[in-house]
Curated annotation (Swiss-Prot):
Name of protein: Ribonucleoside-diphosphate reductase NrdEB subunit alpha
EC number: 1.17.4.1
Role this protein plays: Provides the precursors necessary for DNA synthesis. Catalyzes the biosynthesis of deoxyribonucleotides from the corresponding ribonucleotides.
Organism: Bacillus subtilis (strain 168)
Catalytic activity: a 2'-deoxyribonucleoside 5'-diphosphate + [thioredoxin]-disulfide + H2O = a ribonucleoside 5'-diphosphate + [thioredoxin]-dithiol
UniProt record, GO biological process: deoxyribonucleotide biosynthetic process; intein-mediated protein splicing
Amino acid sequence: MTNTIPNWIKLNNEIMIQKDGKYQFEKDKEAVHSYFVDYINQNTVFFHDLKEKLDYLIKNDYYEEEFLSKYTFEQIKSIYKIAYSYKFRFPSFMSAFKFYNDYALKTNDKTKILERYEDRVSIVALYCADGDYEKAVEEVHTMMKQEYQPATPTFLNAGRKRRGEMVSCFLLEVGDSLNDISRAIDISMQLSKLGGGVALNLNKLRAKGEAIKDVENATKGVVGVMKLLDNAFRYADQMGQRQGSGAVYLSVFHPDITDFLDTKKISADEDVRVKTLSIGVVVPDKFIELAREDKDYYMFYPHSVYKEYGQYLDELDINEMYDELVENPRVRKAKGNARKLLEQLAILRSESGYPYIMFADNVNKVHPNEHISKVKFSNLCVTGETLLLTENGYEKAADLYKKQNDLKVVIDNRTKDFAVGSKGTTIVDAIPMQLTKKDAEIFKVKTKQGYEIRATEWHKFYVKRDGEIQKLQLNQLKTGDKLLVQSAEGAYGKIHEPDLAYIMGIIAGDGTITEKTAKIYLYDNKKVLEQKVTDAVHRIIQKHKVDRAYKHNTSLLPTFNMANPEKQDLLYMNSTVLFDILKKFGMNKETKTRVPEFIFQANKETQAAYLSGLFQTDGCVNANHKAKALTIELTSIHYESLQDVQKLLLNMGVYTTIYSNNKRSQELLPDGKGGSKLYNVKPTHKISIQDRNSRELFMSIVEMKEYDVYKFNLLTETLQPKSRKPKHDFTAEIISIEEDGVEDVYDTTQEDYHSLIFNGIVTGNCSEVLQSSQVSVYTDYDKEDEIGLDISCNLGSMNIVNVMSNQSIASTVRIAIDSLTTVTRKTNIVNAPAVARANTLMRSIGLGQMNLHGFLAQNNIAYESEEAKDFANTYFMMVNFYSLQRSMEIARETGETYYKFDGSTYKSGEYFEKYVTNDYSPQYEKVKKLFGDQHIPNIQDWMKLKEDVMKYGLYHSYRQAIAPTGSISYVQSSTAGVMPIMERIEERTYGNSKTYYPMPGLSAQNWFFYKEAYDMDMFKVVDLIATIQQHVDQGISFTLFLKDTMTTRDLNRIDLYAHHRGIKTLYYARTKDTTQEGCLSCVV
């Protein structure tokens, strides 16, 4: 018996039979017509009307009745009428075949067809609108115009009575116990049965040879678990309609990594080889660094790490912890060579296409929800002596850590909206100070004006560049950058000691402290202060006298004496009692010139009194009437002391600059005996108050000597009523960034705006320490399980060609988000409790895209061109904008935001920085024309959206993910995802016949724009995907296309370039056999 080849297959094959030297693309449409007339129509069950059809499908358990009962029959009929009004025709045989073979509902024996394309679209629209007729109308229009296509699980299952889940993919954490492993396998099978793809994180599993209950060399490692999963996924599928799909991930720092990779070797032994299970490798930046330096590297046994640190290997920041793990003798480790492993990865990917690669730090660096990702030990941190401005004034980070109190901190208003003009401060809540890393590498940032800070390279700063505010990590700063410093009066403490503060200021300026005595000197025009100082000292002694025995001649009411009665040029006071009181409050011989710690937590009157005493003795008003220049200055040989004063003044709203004279010199100074003589002096430094606003504010707060007040007023009266705006604009210019040792570091989290003021400098803060995916702990039957957070996501994709043709980006995104949201709400996977919990709390969706190469080719734009990047930059920005907008609107409508939204960079506004500072409109005129009359969101639109999101929140934790779009691309007659095509005319084998699929709209005119991926420069492909990635909050399915002439070194170069450009993940690496190549271009 011979199998007859159907007529539609013959017609499709005639595409490749040249006529006049050209392919016969028109034959594909003839094949579609034959397929319908000769097969589809002949095998479709006939119903007299829609009611008869629906009654039959419900009665025989093909359709759910519940979702249909939410509409009237007239509404349902109207949706079907809309669908059929389009008179839809599949443009290619492959698209029609894919739909009817993979998606159309069939009788139980699979012999008869129960749905046409219009029927499936109508049911999906009704199901995803969930009783909202107007939404159902929008969705049926959008799907019939093929602007939006739900992913396979939704398109296949929506509305069916016997169905799988509509969620596309899951990620499970696997705990390190037999109960955890068994439960993970069971849940994987349940999810596979429902039609979902499942990825599992194996990094918590003990490596081969680790101990169990202190018995060494007892564990089998990850490969045994992989074999179990491989068999599980092959066994559990969706009733034969959709095969099970699983993937497992392991870090390059796990000791089983080599065995893990060997499971995909073509030559691997059957005992270790996995057949259907996909594998992926997690690559942190530290590994890339070690490979570039051609160094050996260490892998760490997870259980020994857990025993030592109480956290799993994949929960640690390996970039920061690597050296500590290497040096820690209690952490078991194995040695390897980073470059050799990179080479092994390249060889295996060339042979099998595996493993997938995830660049862990590229994912985390731009993760808007990093506050609920794994713990970051090296996030945004400062050293212990750094002063944080709180509602109680300045307090040391280390001291706050010891107290562990909830904080109220002062922030600069410019960090709220990134507006240069929004000067001012606000007091907001923050969590208790945290010790975020021990022995962290420290860098010192110095500014031209004297402000300094010591922090880790990840600490974030607010920088004014090109008139705009940006938030940058320390390792992104450069000399010349202008850091924001506090722009208005802040907050003060509650300590009230103005007399004590005043005398401390006097002594810091013109006093000395010996081993037992405090001395105060008054000379020249300072002698007028005699009575004021004497009265203050007496009040201090009366209030704070130390309970101790003094000599009989010790005065409790010390007075000034004349050092040289004849000259009457020096007054001095000695007091042992005052010495004891000053010592009690932290002032002694060594600390005399530093601002006492309690002053930083004192009230404004007390701080002003200290500054008054200091400036009355060591300060002056420098007035130049000719130049109309007026400055208030304070000179000292102690630079750090002036920095203390600078912080106090900045908190009062007074901007200062510190100047240094680094040359040693001689000065005429009092000799302590009533006379003067030349002394060698150390280099001097001067704090200067120059701008008019700061000068006048200072004089209203701090009491200067009468003569200085006279000079100040005399010149001020000659100035214009209004002065120009200060040039400093409350910024400080960086002059150096230097390594500065290793120390413990601290930080807190201010969840509203993620900003703080350290040492007067406006900075970012740490994100909250939680995990986005939390491992579950499954116990024995008599104990309660601990359910964590696994990850689920339902997908759908927009067809770029049709969306752009219909000028409908905004409306399609809105409709797609609504549809995906309904799927999320209607999903409850009880067999996977951690997935169900995450779906309820996180509400993640994944709006993707397809037909990018098709769109570019049909508009005569080369995939590798600058114009392609220009289009992608604008298009994907718009999708991001409208998806954020719709998620915000749903949050506003429902009053609900996703779990822990308040800790996200969406809430802080940080996420929007690049959008409110950069214009993403098209740069090329040709690309501009493609967008037609569609509104392209501008900076003002983004600023409004930022404001709305910060106010109302977001409903979804994740919104975009660009999947490969395999089968649904064929249904849409689309190129897959955002990747370039592999072949201009695909050849497929079904049964005993071949079929051909020309790329959508392929013609002689666009033939060369449909360049095949294997002929492209992969570096330029990386550039285009990197352009897209910056607008996509999740990942992109990115396949590398290689020729077999490429070396492993070539592949490594591409991988490293992808990492450098911020690519998050690399999917398959496909290799083409160049010996089979033929030339097709001559027969177009």
